[in-house]
Amino acid sequence: MNTLVPMVVEQTNRGERSYDIYSRLLKERIIFLTGQVYDEVASLICAQLLFLESENPSKDIAFYINSPGGVVTSGLAIYDTMQYIRPKVSTVCIGQAASMGSLLMTAGEKGKRFSLPNSRIMVHQPSGGAQGQATDIEIQAREILALRARLNNIYVEHTGQPLDVIEKVMERDKFMTADEAKEFGLIDEVVNKRPAVEDDSAS
């Protein structure tokens, strides 16, 4: 596995300064979620969100997602932080947004949730295993049912779909194209190219 992260060198009045590519993009208020969602990743993303809020609470944050999902509680930590901070968070799906990845994608600011055309989106109900005494298994079963209800309500809030539709779709793995995700309400737009930036000098 190649873990090499490219470096970017910039000229400053104090000489050259180098950044890894993700740190340089963070300066532009761009955050990446790539791979599994787990506690360490969630802590890093939450910290970046909070840092960017402290830098400028009124400027949007761009959150790029390419994730197969992961630990539900870790994903909910990111979700809650996205809702908590003052800047609007725009989400962009690149590659895939599955399971908790799809929940974080749809949790972006309404009207600012995007996907590239060949991305894959998947939603499903949470899964888990339990072992031990019968009472312990019963407790775990109640907890995962409560968690399923919580996640369903989050999807209802952000997609505008009624609860019975969400419950039916979430019953099994449901894969969608970017266009299908837009029709369902998970995203707002499928984008092929970044919009052209107006030339300030022309005004």
From Swiss-Prot:
Entry keywords, A to Z: Cytoplasm, Hydrolase, Protease, Serine protease
Catalytic activity of the protein: Hydrolysis of proteins to small peptides in the presence of ATP and magnesium. alpha-casein is the usual test substrate. In the absence of ATP, only oligopeptides shorter than five residues are hydrolyzed (such as succinyl-Leu-Tyr-|-NHMec, and Leu-Tyr-Leu-|-Tyr-Trp, in which cleavage of the -Tyr-|-Leu- and -Tyr-|-Trp bonds also occurs)
CDD domains documented for this protein: S14_ClpP_2 (cd07017)
Function of the protein: Cleaves peptides in various proteins in a process that requires ATP hydrolysis. Has a chymotrypsin-like activity. Plays a major role in the degradation of misfolded proteins.
HAMAP family cross-referenced by the UniProt entry: ClpP
NCBIfam families from the UniProt entry: clpP (TIGR00493), PRK00277.1 (NF001368), PRK12553.1 (NF009205)
PANTHER family, per the entry: ATP-DEPENDENT CLP PROTEASE PROTEOLYTIC SUBUNIT, ATP-DEPENDENT CLP PROTEASE PROTEOLYTIC SUBUNIT, MITOCHONDRIAL
Protein name per UniProt: ATP-dependent Clp protease proteolytic subunit
Protein source organism: Paramagnetospirillum magneticum (strain ATCC 700264 / AMB-1)
